[in-house]
Amino acid sequence: MGAFTDKQEALVSSSFEAFKTNIPQYSVVFYTSILEKAPVAKDLFSFLANGVDPTNPKLTGHAEKLFGLVRDSAGQLKASGTVVIDAALGSIHAQKAITDPQFVVVKEALLKTIKEAVGDKWSDELSSAWEVAYDELAAAIKKAF
């Protein structure tokens, strides 16, 4: 991977801010997209036991944390070219036996959600910045398994 640029980091950060303008709505978009592609994912998230409920603080909190981790990964990539995570994050994903296809489903849902959040500001460049940041975060999580 080439160096993560200031522009890429700025694209991720600004679109994260757009996501934060309506976390309940975008959390619904995100988790609904995941469940449409992988209904069994419902069993991986205790807060989805009763479906996608935008008033559930665990649902919105988890979405905000995940999107924030990708944003933080963009910052790390710009600063040092690598993503470092807390080992506990790797442990949680290992315990749940998360597979590569599941990481892909989450990435697709994340991109769909950011696309909705930014509206007409969506671009291939913005998509690519989020993809790189997410892929590097996912690689760091898998490495910590």
Swiss-Prot record:
Disulfide bonds: none annotated. Nitrated mainly at Tyr-31 and, to a lower extent, at Tyr-26 and Tyr-134, in effective nodules and particularly in hypoxic conditions; this mechanism may play a protective role in the symbiosis by buffering toxic peroxynitrite NO(2)(-). Nitration level decrease during nodule senescence. Heme b binds at S46, K65, H93, K96. Induction: Negatively regulated by cobalt (Co) in a dose-dependent manner. Suppressed by exposure to excess nitrogen (N); this repression is associated with nodule greening and reduced biological nitrogen fixation (BN) efficiency. O2 binds at H62. One of its GO terms (molecular function) is metal ion binding. This is Leghemoglobin 1. It comes from Glycine max (Soybean). The lineage of its organism: Eukaryota, Viridiplantae, Streptophyta, Embryophyta, Tracheophyta.
